[in-house]
Amino acid sequence: MLILSRKVNEGIVIDDNIHIKVISIDRGSVRLGFEAPESTLILRAELKEAIVSENQKASVCVDESLLENIKKVIKP
């Protein structure tokens, strides 16, 4: 992990097309501004974690024996 110190109005550039700028620092909260191509997905970490969690809940693990029983019922 790269750790950088930045002051208000300072920023960093990632891969020539993603610009991150420190907008403000107030009471332990940092506001960041992002400029990136529209095709770049930018999410807060907690939102990304929630999406991953919901996707895991939505995925279904099917028992192999159940599939075999279905194959017996549906004969070509």
Swiss-Prot record:
The keyword Phosphoprotein does not apply. It is found in: Cytoplasm. Keywords: Bacterial flagellum biogenesis, Cytoplasm, Repressor, RNA-binding, Translation regulation. It comes from the Bacteria. A translational regulator that binds mRNA to regulate translation initiation and/or mRNA stability. Usually binds in the 5'-UTR at or near the Shine-Dalgarno sequence preventing ribosome-binding, thus repressing translation. Its main target seems to be the major flagellin gene, while its function is anatagonized by FliW. GO terms for cellular component: cytosol. Its main location: cytoplasm. The keyword Membrane does not apply. This is Translational regulator CsrA. GO terms for molecular function: mRNA 5'-UTR binding. Transmembrane segments: none annotated. InterPro entries: CsrA, CsrA_sf.
